[in-house]
Amino acid sequence: MYSKEMLQGILLSLGRHNLVIYVNENAKLGYSVKFYLDIRGEEEFLESIQRTLLQYSVLSSIVSSGNRPTLRITGIKNLVIISALLPDLPSYRNDVQEFKDIVAIFVVKRHKTLEGLEELMKIKGVL
């Protein structure tokens, strides 16, 4: 188990958010959006992070893809909790504010509108 400060450090240094925008003909706009946070590492390390996240009611899963397992945090409720845990400090990739902006868009469900989708594309660097 890790302390809150250690968990924040792990999230700042190893956490990498992924925003996937893909064509979905069944969606209202013709596109769907997936957003999740990944942490890569050794399985024992990821399991200890997973146990620590459970203290904050954050559900996650360990996905075995590639050469190292990945701890994946999905679901807007879980990502909102993670966003609240993250301090307003610069991260290694300077993407904390970007993560918080994306979470804010999902919270108010703007990702389901054309304007929100355009905002997400700008954040992602597509537009």
Predicted regions and their residues:
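Internal intein/HINT superfamily modules and their associated LAGLIDADG
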Residues: 1-127
